[in-house]
């Protein structure tokens, strides 16, 4: 028995060793150098070698026999004691190691039942050991006596022990499986609980779906994140990004609580809080904070935490706020202005309190700053905030030393000792405000106003309220990002943009948001600033008097306005849709109009009387907006000049434009098609569809000409307005366009009739004067009513060039005599833009001259207010005083030119305005008023040129620049000319101004960006340089004998050779030269031969009757030049976008793919109407077939425009039928030209007599009543014949009388065809429709005739086989017989109207026909009608022949009839009309053909000849025209 303790020693020792391993879990371990496995230093399962390396048993593979170990790394041998005894329990050690691995997991994480089972297992093992003490003791005795029996008994006991251990291992495996199943069961229960909570959350969420982005989303994240947190059960911390924001502290507590509390914590805390998700955020946050206060122990600040904690702020890695459009609750922490304020997230209250507690603990425990401590710009610091009443985190934003001024220079230090600081400014990163700390003793004058405006305090020692940050507190707070987020209200600006935000706006802003939780809707983020709107939170969250929208409230209170209301620059206006301007009639023309709106005789609107397109547009707009709900087209925030559709007081929608924003949900609109205005509510305004924008405005603003208010009063009297309305309102009138004023205002004279013949017209202008309601303007001369218009001739090219040169000269070298511009070059000079004409003509005033201008105006008024007009002989460049009637002002001016005896064009050189005034408005300028220099400068933008390839600025560019600059204050920089030292005029400048954003804009770059200008390329000017046309495309003739005399007569020498063609130019050089813009020069006028009579070829006849001829002597030169043009223009590339202008010379590629010289006549959309200079005819072609280049400018135009001398067309203009005759008669024909009168202008028409084949053209046209001539007798005389003419006649016109007896010239005199007759009226007969002219005009054939013709076909041959003519032979048989021998029939020689003949149809057969008219003369073509079918065709002579007489006995089958029962519709919307019968549409014609084709028809005659009217019926006795009536293509005619 005494030996028993010794026997149990090994077993007890083994279990004690197992227990020690469990107790030392977490003590220092030894890591294997090779495999990295860690083992306990106390376990003894390792070996530390003498070389310093440590290895585990597995890596060394030691046995008891080993006495030395060689290190696997450094191969150093180490002696080992093989009797350490640690190897005897190898088996137990292995089992123990397995359990050791399991123990931390299973025991720490399993349930309480599992722990109990493990304890029972340990007790059982101990009992098993005690049971076998005797055996073990026996085994030890056996070892001492070396008896075999004891050895056997010991082996039996060991075997039994191993069986017990095997049973215990199986029990452990069973327990582990149960643990896994229990964990899965618990997970399933928790997931079901979360599903229930999610369903509860969704129901609450749907209830308040209008605020689905509130902070509850951030406070309680989605379920998926919480499911991941079940990893706590396995002791694996979830990844930080997936941890929910509100449960951070709970997770920390779960991880480090004892294992017995794990399940209890999950059930008591988490489940208790989650059902309150739908409740107020205040309740949720308070519960979380109460739970966390204990966790955040104050001791944590003074010592290193025992366990590594995860950061409290889990959303720091996520950007602030939700997605665009979401909403959440926030506090406004600081307001600078409505576009600059800071907010704090409502869901971050917990973080804010934690942050406050930690910062207060740190600042209260830490020591004060030392005067030798260093402060650095941008460094983090803690400050005891005055405004916030607590210690706050801050960033140093400004440091000013004591010895320096209160302005930090760029080179001043950014690091200062505390005792050197005079002023420090700190930005509170968690609140958004800045505070200024000023050390006592700093002079007040050094403190800037912005410092005083900010929260500031004066103190003796900065160290008292500042604490410097330390690394460990930074580590604790590094994950709590700054809580203040900068924000700006979306799309609002101050009510007065120039003055900025008023203090009242900030005050009202604070009243609405201060100390309130508001809902913030995020739109987007710009440069770290959230663009938001602050709104009223849901009613169930927080009761508040916050408005529904804060920005709407500020706008409503007129403290702000929407940004769209402030964008008034032309840049923004260009992005707004606009109507096309109204189409204006030409000056000095008469048009039919209706007066649609009248404000006064000087301000009214009219519409041109056109087609029905405008009425159709009004109807379409009315139907669309009447049936449209309007929700998608509502205008919530109208903008000035916005196009729209507005409802009028009659309830109908019309096109309109916003012209005023009076407020109170009202807008003022102008109805652009009528001219009237109205103030309506915003509900009666709709957005306009694009399809309604295409039509131009219909209302044209006008002013009555020649008259002004009675007795020169400033305004029209009420009686004058009423009388004018009574005479003109909504009436059709004739309007005479006198002049087109600025802004497209027409100066007109109205007449009270539409120009009805034989009806006297009355001028409304004169009527108002006669009735004493108006007066004639000063200087107006009563005109003779018989001569209403005065002919105005276009100036000659010489006059135009002279005027252009005159206008380009500076007004006067004395414009600014006292200005030294050399000293102002390259300096920024402030100016006021007073007038903009084009980018190369801008008038500016120095800002300093404003007082001078006002003083000058006062002097002018005092000098000329009561002055009387005196006759003065005005001349160019004279100085004068000008009265501006509209503004009742007097200005200094200088006469530019005398327009007429009573009208003068003057330059108001103090404001840069040019205008035409009556001489009554001029006075002599007093000498004392000339002493002051001119107050405006004429400038020109540099480094730009017009876009589109033109050398002239487009009206669009001028209007854009004028709208953008006129009246603006800008900065100019005078540009120095590198080549010339003297001052050029206009002054070359660059102009800079501010846009609506306050950014500096270069006006030249602005025009380039708009596509209205191109950057000017600077090219070195060489004296010997030439343009491309002068270098490679001009092939001038020799100059000795080819001199133009007085621009009229030219000697042509056919033997003269042209100059040598210059060498070929490279394609690249050619294209580079072409693409450079150049001034378009004109071609020389046509050279008229210096002979009285010359031969010529008619190239074409113009649409106005102008005859273009090319002299025979010039044809060779024309062909030669044409060939050379083709060889020189083979390598032209694609043309860049080019702006064509009227009269510009160009190269034209014709339909024959050849190049010709041309001139632009008109630009029509994407096409250009051009004239071929050397051939005369015009054509409309695409712009891609033109090239802006001069071809041989030294060679005159070859074709000469001519007109018949003393010949007056009927109606004073050549009618279309007369022009058609001229074109057919003369085109490509050789004629004789007799020059009667040379033109005064070389470009005008040459007056001639033209003879073709010896006949005078004037006589020919007068004979056929196309014109009248004053010299008919002279023209009847035989034209002078030369020897050449006589020879020509003898060769060409020699006719023998024998030919007159030939059978070919014998044309029988035939009677007209017999007519077929219809049955008596009321009788029904079967008919066939042979030809349809229009829906109610057809040719029919009686069906009985057709049947008879086919039934009577039989052979009429005699016994000899020769056919004969039988009385019973049908027409078809006779025509078949004639078609077999048609070659033998004589040709037709008589072409009089109604002449019977045979004509060949398209099927190659010949049919009976008659001549209708001659359609063309060269070549001759005849219009014929097939009498048996009614159809017509235009045929040449080879398809006509004489008709055999026996075919004349058959009556014409086709009968022309008019169909009764229907008529053209009053309203037919079909666009395509029948050209020869426009009252019917093509759709109606095709529908009628469908009704007639392939049907058996019957006709009932309604009226006898000559105009036969029938009604057609189908087989069912229904009128055939009823489908047309049902389709709306015809109206029933009762």
From Swiss-Prot:
Transmembrane segments: none annotated. The keyword Repeat applies. This is RING finger protein 17. Seems to be involved in regulation of transcriptional activity of MYC. In vitro, inhibits DNA-binding activity of Mad-MAX heterodimers. Can recruit Mad transcriptional repressors (MXD1, MXD3, MXD4 and MXI1) to the cytoplasm. May be involved in spermiogenesis. It comes from Macaca fascicularis (Crab-eating macaque). Keywords: Cytoplasm, Developmental protein, Differentiation, Metal-binding, Nucleus, Repeat, Spermatogenesis, Zinc, Zinc-finger. GO terms for cellular component: cytoplasm; nucleus. Residues 637-695, 873-932, 1139-1196, 1390-1450 form the Tudor domain.
């Amino acid at each position: 028995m005494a030996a028993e303790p010794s026997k149990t020693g090994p077993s007890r020792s083994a279990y004690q060793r197992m227990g020690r391993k469990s107790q030392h879990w977490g003590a220092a371990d030894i890591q294997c150098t090779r495999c990295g496995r860690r083992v306990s230093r106390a376990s003894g399962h390792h070996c530390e070698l003498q070389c310093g390396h440590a290895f585990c048993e597995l890596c060394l593979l030691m046995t008891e026999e080993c006495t030395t170990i060689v290190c696997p790394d450094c191969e150093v041998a180490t002696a080992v004691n093989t009797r350490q005894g640690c190897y005897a329990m190898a088996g137990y050690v292995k089992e123990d190691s397995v359990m050791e691995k399991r123990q931390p997991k299973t025991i720490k994480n399993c349930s309480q039942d599992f722990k109990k089972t493990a304890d029972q297992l340990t007790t059982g093992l101990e009992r098993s050991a005690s049971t076998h003490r005797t055996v073990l003791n026996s085994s030890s005795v056996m070892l001492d006596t070396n008896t075999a029996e004891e050895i056997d008994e010991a082996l039996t006991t060991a075997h039994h022990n191993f069986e017990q251990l095997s049973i215990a291992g199986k029990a452990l495996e069973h327990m582990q499986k149960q643990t896994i199943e229990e964990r899965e069961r618990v997970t399933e229960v928790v997931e079901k609980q979360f599903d229930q909570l999610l369903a509860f959350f969704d129901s609450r969420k749907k209830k308040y779906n209008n605020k689905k982005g509130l902070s509850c989303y951030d406070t309680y994240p989605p379920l998926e994140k919480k499911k991941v947190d079940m990893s706590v059960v396995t002791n694996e911390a979830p990844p930080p990004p997936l941890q929910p924001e509100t449960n951070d502290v709970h997770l920390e507590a779960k991880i480090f609580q004892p294992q017995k509390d794990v399940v209890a914590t999950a059930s008591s805390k988490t489940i208790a809080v989650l059902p309150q998700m739908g409740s107020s955020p205040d309740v949720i946050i308070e519960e979380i904070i109460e739970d966390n206060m204990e966790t955040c122990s104050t001791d944590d600040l003074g010592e290193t935490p025992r366990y590594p904690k995860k950061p409290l702020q889990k959303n720091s890695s996520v950007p602030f706020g939700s997605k665009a459009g979401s909403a959440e609750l926030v506090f406004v922490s600081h307001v600078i202005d409505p576009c600059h304020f800071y907010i704090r997230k409502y869901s971050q209250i917990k973080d804010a309190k934690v942050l406050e507690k930690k910062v207060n603990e740190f600042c209260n425990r830490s020591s004060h700053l030392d005067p030798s401590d260093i402060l650095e710009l941008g460094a983090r610091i803690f400050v005891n905030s005055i405004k916030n009443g607590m210690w706050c985190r801050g960033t140093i934003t400004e440091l000013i030393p004591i010895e320096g001024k209160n302005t930090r220079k760029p080179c001043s230090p950014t690091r200062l000792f505390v005792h050197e600081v005079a002023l420090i400014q700190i930005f509170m990163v968690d609140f958004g405000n800045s505070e200024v700390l000023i050390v006592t003793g700093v002079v007040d004058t050094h403190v800037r106003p912005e410092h005083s405006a900010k929260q500031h305090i004066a103190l003796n020692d900065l160290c008292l309220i500042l604490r410097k940050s330390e690394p460990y507190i930074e580590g604790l707070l590094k994950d709590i990002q700054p809580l203040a987020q900068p924000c700006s209200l979306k799309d609002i600006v101050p009510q007065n943009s120039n003055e900025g935000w008023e203090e009242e706006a900030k005050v009202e802003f604070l009243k609405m948001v201060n100390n309130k939780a508001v809902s913030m809707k995020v739109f987007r983020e710009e440069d770290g600033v959230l663009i938001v709107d602050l709104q009223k939170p849901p009613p169930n969250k927080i009761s508040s008097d916050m408005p529904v929208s804060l920005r709407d409230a500020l706008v409503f209170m007129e403290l702000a306005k929407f940004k769209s209301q402030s964008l008034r620059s032309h840049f923004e206006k260009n992005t707004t849709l606009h109507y096309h301007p109204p189409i204006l009639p030409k000056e000095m023309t008469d048009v039919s109009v209706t007066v649609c709106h009248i404000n006064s005789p000087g301000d009214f609107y009219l519409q041109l009387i056109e087609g029905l397109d405008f009425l159709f547009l009004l109807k379409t707009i009315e139907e669309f907006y009447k049936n449209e709900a309007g929700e998608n087209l509502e205008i919530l925030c109208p903008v000035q000049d916005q196009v729209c559709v507005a409802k009028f007081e009659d309830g109908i929608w019309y096109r309109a434009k916003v012209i005023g924003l009076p407020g109170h949900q009202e807008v003022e609109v102008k109805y652009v098609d009528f001219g009237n205005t109205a103030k309506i509510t915003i509900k009666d305004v709709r957005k306009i569809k694009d399809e309604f924008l295409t039509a131009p405005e219909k209302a044209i603003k006008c002013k009555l000409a020649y008259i002004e208010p009675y007795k020169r009063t400033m305004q029209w009297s009420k009686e004058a307005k009423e009388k004018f309305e009574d005479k003109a309102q909504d009436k059709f009138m004739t309007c005479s366009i006198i002049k087109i004023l600025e802004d497209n205002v027409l100066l007109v004279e109205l007449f009270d009739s539409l120009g009805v013949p034989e009806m006297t017209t009355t001028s409304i202008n004169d009527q108002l004067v006669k009735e004493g309601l108006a007066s004639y303007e000063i200087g107006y001369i009563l005109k003779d009513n018989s001569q209403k218009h005065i002919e105005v001739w276009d100036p000659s090219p010489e006059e135009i060039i002279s005027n252009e040169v005159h206008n380009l000269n500076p007004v006067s070298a004395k414009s600014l005599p006292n200005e030294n511009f050399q000293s102002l070059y390259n300096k920024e000079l402030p100016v006021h833009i007073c007038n903009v004409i084009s980018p190369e003509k801008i008038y500016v005033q120095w800002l300093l001259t404003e007082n001078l201008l006002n003083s000058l105006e006062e002097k002018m008024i005092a000098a000329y207010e009561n002055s009387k007009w005196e006759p003065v002989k005005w001349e160019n460049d004279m100085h004068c005083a000008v009265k501006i009637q509209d503004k009742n002002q007097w200005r200094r001016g200088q006469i530019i030119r005398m327009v007429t005896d009573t009208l003068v064009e003057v330059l108001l050189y103090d404001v840069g305005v040019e205008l035409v005034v009556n001489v009554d408005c001029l006075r002599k300028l007093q000498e004392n008023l000339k002493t002051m220099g001119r107050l405006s400068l004429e400038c020109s933008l540099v480094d730009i040129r017009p876009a589109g390839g033109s050398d002239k600025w487009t009206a669009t560019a001028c209007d854009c620049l004028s709208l953008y600059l006129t009246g603006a204050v800008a900065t100019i920089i005078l540009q120095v000319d590198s080549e010339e030292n003297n001052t050029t005029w206009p002054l070359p400048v660059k102009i800079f101004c501010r846009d609506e954003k306050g950014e500096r804009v270069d006006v030249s770059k602005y025009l380039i960006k708009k596509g209205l200008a191109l950057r000017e390329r600077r090219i070195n000017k060489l004296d010997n340089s030439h343009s491309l046309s002068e270098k490679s495309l001009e092939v001038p003739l020799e100059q000795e004998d080819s001199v133009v005399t007085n621009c009229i007569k030219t000697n042509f020498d056919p033997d003269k050779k042209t100059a040598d063609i210059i060498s070929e130019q490279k394609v690249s050089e050619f294209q580079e030269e072409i693409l450079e813009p150049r001034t378009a020069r004109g071609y020389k006028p046509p050279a008229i031969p210096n002979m009285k009579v010359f031969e010529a070829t008619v190239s074409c006849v113009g649409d106005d009757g102008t005859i273009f001829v090319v002299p025979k002597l010039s044809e060779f030169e024309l062909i030669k030049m044409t060939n050379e043009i083709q060889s020189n223009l083979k390598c032209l590339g694609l043309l860049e976008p080019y702006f064509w202008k009227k009269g510009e010379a160009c190269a034209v590629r014709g339909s024959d793919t050849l190049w010709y010289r041309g001139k632009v006549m008109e630009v029509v959309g994407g096409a250009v109407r051009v004239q071929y200079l050397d051939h005369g005819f015009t054509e409309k072609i695409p712009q891609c077939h033109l090239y802006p280049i001069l071809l041989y400018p030294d060679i005159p135009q070859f074709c000469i425009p001519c007109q018949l001398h003393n010949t007056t067309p009927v109606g004073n203009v050549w009618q279309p039928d007369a022009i058609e005759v001229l074109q057919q008669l003369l085109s490509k024909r050789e004629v004789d030209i007799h020059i009667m009168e040379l033109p005064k202008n070389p470009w005008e028409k040459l007056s001639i007599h033209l003879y073709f084949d010896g006949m005078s053209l004037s006589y020919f046209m007068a004979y056929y009543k196309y014109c009248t001539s004053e010299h008919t007798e002279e023209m009847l005389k035989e034209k002078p014949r030369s020897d050449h003419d006589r020879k020509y006649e003898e060769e060409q016109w020699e006719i023998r009388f024998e030919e007159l007896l030939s059978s070919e010239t014998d044309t029988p005199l035939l009677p007209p065809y017999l007519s077929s007759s219809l049955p008596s009226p009321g009788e029904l007969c079967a008919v066939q429709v042979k030809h349809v002219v229009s829906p109610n005009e057809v040719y029919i054939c009686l069906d009985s005739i057709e049947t008879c013709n086919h039934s009577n076909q039989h052979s009429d041959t005699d016994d000899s086989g020769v056919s004969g003519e039988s009385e019973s032979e049908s027409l078809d048989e006779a025509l078949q017989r004639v078609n077999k021998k048609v070659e033998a029939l004589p040709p037709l020689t008589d072409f009089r109207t109604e002449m019977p003949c045979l004509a060949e149809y398209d099927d190659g057969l010949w049919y009976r026909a008659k001549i209708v008219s001659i359609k063309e003369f060269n070549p001759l073509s005849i219009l014929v009608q097939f009498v048996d079918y009614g159809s017509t065709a235009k045929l040449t002579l080879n398809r006509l022949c004489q008709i055999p007489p026996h075919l004349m006995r058959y009556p014409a089958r086709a009968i022309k009839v008019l169909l009764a029962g229907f008529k053209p519709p009053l309203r037919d919307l079909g666009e395509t009309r029948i050209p020869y019968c426009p009252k019917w549409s093509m759709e109606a014609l095709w529908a009628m053909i469908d009704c007639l084709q392939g049907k058996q028809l019957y006709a009932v005659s309604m009226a006898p000849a000559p105009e036969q009217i029938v009604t057609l019926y189908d087989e069912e006795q229904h009128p055939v025209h009823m489908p047309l009536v049902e389709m709306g293509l015809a109206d029933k005619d009762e």
